[in-house]
């Protein structure tokens, strides 16, 4: 009688089929995890922007900071300006939004859905992962963030997939 060593063709096919099933389940689970991570990253960028603007603006009122929102110690927005007549004008929401969405912005967050793009932009339309910041009046900044789980089309029109906050600059 021969002493056969090794696996039969059927045994090998069963192992390959099991590995295929495990791989398929793993890919679906991985996509769910990455979708949730992107959604949470967009929410975190939104919350951090609100805290950043509030903290930086409070520097104008707490101490005598001349400039806020600097990048690497340079640039920024002046807390106030004084004209030749001695009239003081304080920083407006429009100046803050223009600075935060310009080329000299201190913000370095990337859109979690498209890492080639900056997360914060000045726009009234929200694409997935973008934090849209607009000056809605002289003293109000509106922050709108859209996120999606990627299961359907553009879910940014669904208010359940948006965060909206208003920051008052007084």
Segments predicted by a language model, with ranges:
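Periplasmic/extracellular, small/polar-rich flexible segments of pilin-like filament-forming proteins
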Residues: 55-170
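Extended, polar beta-sheet/loop recognition surfaces of beta-rich domains
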Residues: 39-64
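Amphipathic alpha-helical segments typified by the pilin-like N-terminal helix
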Residues: 1-48
